[in-house]
């Protein structure tokens, strides 16, 4: 699974070290790699890139795109740019209720709900 998440070449000579010695990007990939052997039906990722720099975010998002054909992936994020880049469908929730569920591009180009549009445009949140 380390090879699946493109981590093997970076850590193969450091397998005896602590995970905390890895970069934050590598730690995120390691967390994902630990799940893959059990073949989960769903990968739930809560703010998977919130602690990463832009380069680390790009690497983790690329990994998400590579895994999407093999797994159902649900990403919880408040980062609208990431939601647009990393998903095919979006669900906008407010106060625990689904406000809108549609194709990502449709949500960002022509949201059907004013609350969705307001959030995407940064009027609140």
List the predicted regions and their residue ranges:
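Conserved ABC ATPase "signature" region
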Residues: 1-13
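Conserved ABC ATPase signature
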Residues: 18-22, 26
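Conserved catalytic motifs of ABC-family nucleotide-binding domains
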Residues: 39
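Catalytic Walker B motif of ABC-type/P-loop ATPase nucleotide-binding domains
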Residues: 43-46
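A short, surface-exposed alpha-helical micro-motif characterized by mixed small hydrophobic
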Residues: 83-85
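ABC ATPase "signature
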Residues: 101-102
